[in-house]
Regions:
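Signature of N-terminal electron-transfer/Fe-S-associated modules in redox systems
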Residues: 1-178
Length: 178
C-alpha cells in the first residue's frame, strides 16, 4: 500500500503518489527525483554524504535541520520543506544562470574540497547552520562549526579548510532563501 507525499523541494511543491512506505528519503531523491548531489556513502547515517536540510515551523519561525536522508523514511517529510545541494544556488536575474550560495562560495574560497564526494553533504550542513545562525546576524564560532558538522566525514581535505569556510560565512553577502 502506498500513500501520497506532499512537500516543498526548494521552491517547488512536490506531490508524489505511489511512494512505497519502505522507501527512504535517499531513494526517493536519487531514484525517483534524480537528485544526484545527494550521495549514498555508508547507508547507515554515519558519513553525512546523504545530508539534506528539512525546514519545519517551530514557534512561528522556520527551523532548519540537517538530516541523513539514508536513514529517514520518505513519508516522514510530508508537509515539510526540503533542500538539497541542487536547490540552494540563487539564479542571477540578469543572466538566468545559477550563482553560488554563500556556503558554496566559502568552500571555494577556502579550498575546502578535493574529491568532492562529501562536498554536497557539507554544503547542506553548512546551509542549515547558515540559515539558523548567519542569516539572523549571529557569528559562527569554531566550536559551533565543529558541533554542526560533526555528522559529516571527509577523507581527503581534512577539516581545517571546511571549518575556515564555516567561520567566514558572516563576511559574505547574505543570500535570500528561495
Amino acid at each position: 500500500m502506498t500513500a501520497p507525499i506532499r512537500f516543498f523541494k526548494g521552491d517547488k511543491l512536490m506531490l508524489l503518489d505511489n511512494v512505497p512506505p519502505s522507501h527512504t528519503l535517499l531513494e526517493l531523491l536519487r531514484e525517483d527525483l534524480g537528485c544526484t548531489a545527494v550521495k549514498e556513502g555508508c547507508n547507515e547515517g554515519d558519513c553525512g554524504a546523504c545530508t539534506v536540510v528539512l525546514g519545519e515551523a517551530d514557534q512561528g519561525q522556520l527551523r532548519f535541520r540537517a538530516v541523513n536522508s539514508c536513514i529517514r523514511m520518505a513519508h516522514s517529510v510530508n508537509n515539510m520543506a526540503l533542500w538539497t545541494a541542487e536547490d540552494i544556488a540563487p539564479k542571477d536575474v540578469a543572466s538566468g544562470s545559477d550563482t553560488l550560495h554563500p556556503v558554496q562560495e566559502a568552500l571555494v574560497q577556502c579550498h575546502a574540497s578535493q574529491c568532492g564526494f562529501c562536498t554536497p553533504g557539507f554544503v547542506m550542513s553548512l546551509f542549515a547552520m547558515y540559515q539558523n545562525h548567519t542569516s539572523k546576524g549571529h557569528a559562527i564560532s569554531r566550536e559551533l562549526a565543529q558541533q554542526e558538522l560533526s555528522g559529516n566525514l571527509c577523507r581527503c581535505t581534512g577539516y581545517r579548510p571546511i571549518l575556515d569556510a564555516a567561520q567566514m560565512l558572516d563576511a559574505l553577502p547574505l543570500a535570500q532563501l528561495m
